Amino acid sequence: MTAEHYSLVGDIGGTNARFALVKQGSIEPEAIEVLPCRDYENLDQAVVTYLERVGVASVRQACLAVASPLRGTRVTMTNNHWRFDIEAVRQVFGWSAFKVINDFTAMALGVPHVSDANLVHVCGGPGDPGRPKLVMGPGTGLGVSGLVPIRNGWVPLVTEGGHVDFAPTDDTEMDVLRLLRARFGRVSVERILCGQGLLNLYQAHAEIRGVAAPLDAPEKITAAAVDASDALAGEVLQHFCEMLGRTAGNSALTLGSLGGVYLCGGMLPGFLDFFLGSPFREAFVAKGRMRPLMEFTPVYVVTEPYTGLLGAAEALGNSEV
């Protein structure tokens, strides 16, 4: 590969770092590699290893999406040991430009580039493509972002919408709030609508009912719900989907996202059929007088595994980022 024709893009989470190359003027990632973060002392080592694997000595510029709040030039990863200074890394590699963006900002920027084959329609539509899009994703946490259309593209909205207060709507949810408040103090929607949150919800339901909670990991709960081997797991996952629908609907109303709601992240594709049959749809549209507006808003599950890389590639040439 000829180095001067490529830029480096990456999507770095708590566990893995995904890297790819993109040609100048393109957003299609090539030579994708996934490196375990624990195997590398720092970002520099991981980048060097990646470039060696793909046979490129250097690239002109780079954009990395990171699972971390961004303030200034110092980056401290939320769920792994990497720490780096943006300008110092740029100088080490001799890049002409180095952008670092939030991982969910990248997810949002990638959504317009996801093919129809990797979008599963959940409900609603046809929507209005000229209006904002909401991007939400339960995974390690609950990411929330938005896209506002401009003349030649999109402006991403960097938010911490997963940290808004959890608002219970019935007696069971009041009990869930009481139990989680005793554990965490303040209870955000992310305390429920993410992988660890599903486990929190399962344990709370078990305590409310006075029954055992033998499942100790979110993937065990989803597996038991899908194969109907644990009744409590099934009910809890239904409740999880319902609350996700309600929360997505609230965010859609706030943003005015008639351009669509896009559900990303690693969780939902793992139990997609269950999700499509869950109370999500009704919870999303059940907004009283606003129901017709919600029914007009299309909702999709994004199954593209490298949406963040697409977004990082988009960010390279997006002057709004």
Swiss-Prot record:
From the UniProt record, list the reaction(s) this protein catalyses: D-glucose + ATP = D-glucose 6-phosphate + ADP + H(+)
Any one Pfam family match given in the protein's UniProt record, by short name:
Glucokinase
Tell me the GO molecular function terms. Answer: ATP binding; D-glucose binding; glucokinase activity
- Please classify the protein's predominant subcellular localization into one broad category: cytoplasm
One annotated GO biological process: glycolytic process
| Compartments in which it is found | Cytoplasm
Could you tell me the EC number(s) of this protein?
2.7.1.2
**Keywords in alphabetical order:** ATP-binding, Cytoplasm, Glycolysis, Kinase, Nucleotide-binding, Transferase
SUPFAM superfamilies referenced in this protein's UniProt entry, alphabetically:
Actin-like ATPase domain
Spell out the family assignment given in the record's similarity comment.
Answer: Belongs to the bacterial glucokinase family.
Q: What is this protein called?
A: Glucokinase
The coding gene here is: glk
